[in-house]
Amino acid sequence: MERIKGLILTDGARIGIIGGGPAGSFFSIFASKLARDIGKALDFTIYERKTFANHGASGCNMCAGVISESLVQSLALEGINLPSSVVRWGIESYFFHTQNGSVQIKSSRLQQRGIATVFRGGGPAGSLEKDVQSFDGFLLQKAIDCGTQVKHVIVDEIRLDGGKPGLYSGGRILQDCDLLVGAFGVKASTSKMCEKLGTGYKIPPTIKATQSEIELGRDWVASRFGHSIHIFLLRIPGIKFISIIPKGDYITISALGKEPGVNHIKTFLDHPVMKKMLPSGFKIPERFCHCFPKINVGAARKPFANRLVFVGDAGSSRLYKDGIGSAYITSKAAAYTALLHGVGEEDFRGYYLPVCKTLNRDNLFGRFLFSANDFISIIPPVSRCYFKVIQLEQDGLQRNTPYGDVLWDMFTGSRFYKDIFVRALSPWLTMHLLSVMIASFFKKVFFPHTRK
Ligand SMILES: Cc1cc2nc3c(=O)[nH]c(=O)nc-3n(C[C@H](O)[C@H](O)[C@H](O)COP(=O)(O)OP(=O)(O)OC[C@H]3O[C@@H](n4cnc5c(N)ncnc54)[C@H](O)[C@@H]3O)c2cc1C
């Protein structure tokens, strides 16, 4: 594609958005609001194959459904307040469970239950809950309220022949685009279609995850899991970590690893640490709602071209955390670039790419932090000391809670990884942890019979 300068959206310009997940909805919300503010009349259409009304995987964008504290706040500032029909549960703390015990972490920063858990679709397969509103459906409605048209069709072909991208479905043209926004995530064959356009775009690397919805009843969920997300660092082969997210009658079990499967979930539910949290006599259901989505663990190559930009998971996303928050960041940056600067390759390179690069660079620090966390969790003496220090902090025996804050920020995704990295490597923290480990070692050697 030739490089053109001065491509701008003029009155009547048509913007086609493939994907009505968070990234597609955010893009059209921000771009249409900005267009109104600067007095431009633009035409937005989202093409989304799902309606987000069905139960189970067919109506859902398959994720753990944790809306980070920072995103809840950013949305509120945009005037988007999540209603109680969307929020399944408010979260106020995290529990970390290891072979050697559990520790609860709270953050003094968190406003009351400021993290929300949601279902992305109409709820788990087989669920009888009636008052569930999908998070993605809610955002899509916000886009419609801003004047965007939504068409529930699959875009199965894109052509670039006339200079403007053309979208097709079943051989019929849907529209020509003055700007095409790729907000199709990483789960779809659509990404391959875009790679073949020859603009240099390459989809981000992904790993497989597994998600399961287990029904335990609201009372059990409330009493055993509370308003907390539970992270399990249990050294189950093939599993990096497992999170449990309470959602009313259900818990969502989200596992990341090499090739997580249903058997990993069954092994986990049978693990003594987890068994304690299940009703006595609990039997793993024969059938339960589960899926194997892919999770973005890197950056797309060249997520833009003339009249073309890729946002959300199809562009750049934060490692393991806050993917929806990343969709918010990239969609907003792409919308502002398109409306305020132009839709040429050079415009996106100048104003959109730096935002993606910030996320991509930050993920390098995230990768280091998660590797360090893996290392700590797999070596029992180190893991024991680390969680002991955190426990002391949280019990209020120490004034500050730097270790707890590091874990909190890593797992909630509420701070940039670089910032967490700098704090985690502070000489004071490292020396303190080492001194606790050495003290614990000598205690074990010289006073083996004293209690821990
Ligand atoms: C196991 C797991 C757990 C996660 N947990 C969290 C979490 O707790 N919190 C968090 O913030 N993030 C989480 N994420 C990441 C989060 O799911 C993504 O970052 C987020 O969904 C990205 O939004 P998106 O709009 O870019 O893509 P998606 O949500 O994937 O939306 C893409 C949309 O495009 C549509 N589409 C694709 N191709 C076409 C086509 N050709 N025609 C029409 N429609 C099309 C799809 O139907 C879909 O609706 C998790 C991910 C995984 C895999």
Describe the residue ranges of each PLM region.
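Short beta-strand to alpha-helix junction loop
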Residues: C63-V66, Q111-Q141, S189, S212, ...
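N-terminal FAD cofactor-binding segment of flavoenzymes
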Residues: T51-V103
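FAD/FMN-dependent oxidoreductases across multiple families
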Residues: S127, L174, E259-T337, V343
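Predominantly flavin-linked oxidoreductase catalytic cores and closely associated redox partners
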Residues: F30-K33, Q141-M277, S317
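Conserved Rossmann-like nucleotide-cofactor binding loop
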Residues: A23, F52, K187
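Beta1/beta-strand and adjacent pyrophosphate-binding region of the FAD-binding site
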Residues: G6-A23
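Glycine-rich FAD pyrophosphate-binding loop
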Residues: S32-C60
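C-terminal helical "tail/cap" subdomain of flavin- and related membrane-associated enzymes
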Residues: L339-K452
